Regions:
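C-terminal accessory module of base-excision DNA glycosylases/AP lyases that mediates lesion recognition
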Residues: 1-27, 106-111, 125-200
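A positional/architectural concept
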Residues: 9-42, 47-62
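Non-catalytic interaction surface on structured domains
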Residues: 10-12, 23, 31, 35, ...
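Alpha-helical ds-nucleic-acid-binding substructure associated with the helix-hairpin-helix region
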Residues: 16, 48-49, 53-121, 174
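Structural motif
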Residues: 29-38, 83-86, 172-180
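A general alpha-helix detector
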Residues: 38-43, 74-78, 112-116, 148-152, ...
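Short alpha-helical scaffolding segments that buttress acidic/His motifs in well-ordered protein cores
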Residues: 39-44, 92-96, 131, 182-186
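Short amphipathic alpha-helical interaction patches enriched in hydrophobic/aromatic residues
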Residues: 43, 75, 79, 99-100, ...
């Protein structure tokens, strides 16, 4: 994944991306490790603050609950004592039972990876897309259900209202084969606008 090549291509194909880059500056290439822990962490982080997610994750690590075998042998009460809700305890067990071949995933198409991951209870399309983008470094994936991306696109493209998931997915086709970098740029632009002008 070459950020410089991608941003040059996007700027040449869409002048508004060039304008956004002038505001955001160069985009960092932030990749995270792939594997079981990354997906488990994504489940833990769903619908709670970063601080709360970090606190729960640290308790889980201390208890050994980042290992699928230990999670499977633990009672729901033990998992809940580490801070997981009843629902997330079930999701953690479902992910542990899924026995995903994480090395094998790397060889699949992005579409097939997303299909594989979303078969697991607790992993939706957004979580799978973020995993493919940030843990596997795929260049042509776009999380069109992400509210920040939708709002950033509304502001950057001067749209009358925030585009819905399907509308943004259609828009993003024009940014292929660098849709993941377009997403990174839109997130950076969202943060820029939010910090300077206020964003609803």
């Amino acid at each position: 994944l070459c950020i410089q090549e991608a941003t040059a291509w996007l700027s040449a194909h869409e002048p508004r991306f060039s304008q956004a880059l002038q505001k955001t500056g160069p985009l960092p290439l932030r990749l995270r490790p792939d594997g079981f822990e990354r997906l488990l962490s994504a489940i833990v982080s769903q619908q709670i603050s970063v601080a709360a997610a970090d606190a729960i994750w640290n308790r889980m690590k201390a208890a050994g609950f980042t290992n699928p075998k230990i999670i499977l042998s633990a009672s729901e009460e033990k998992l809940r004592s580490a801070g997981l809700s009843r629902q997330k305890s079930k999701y953690a067990k479902a992910l542990s039972e899924a026995d995903i071949d994480y090395e094998g995933l790397r060889t699949l198409s992005s579409e097939d990876i997303i299909k594989t991951l979303t078969r697991v209870s607790g992993i939706g399309v957004w979580t799978a897309e973020i995993y493919v983008m940030f843990s596997l470094g795929r260049a042509d994936v776009f999380a069109s259900g992400d509210l920040a991306l939708q709002e950033s696109a509304r502001v950057l493209f001067a749209l009358p209202e925030r585009p819905k998931e399907k509308e943004l997915r259609v828009m993003s086709q024009d940014w292929s084969p660098w849709r993941a970098v377009a997403a990174r740029l839109l997130w950076a632009y969202y943060n820029y606008v939010k910090s300077r002008e206020g964003i609803r």
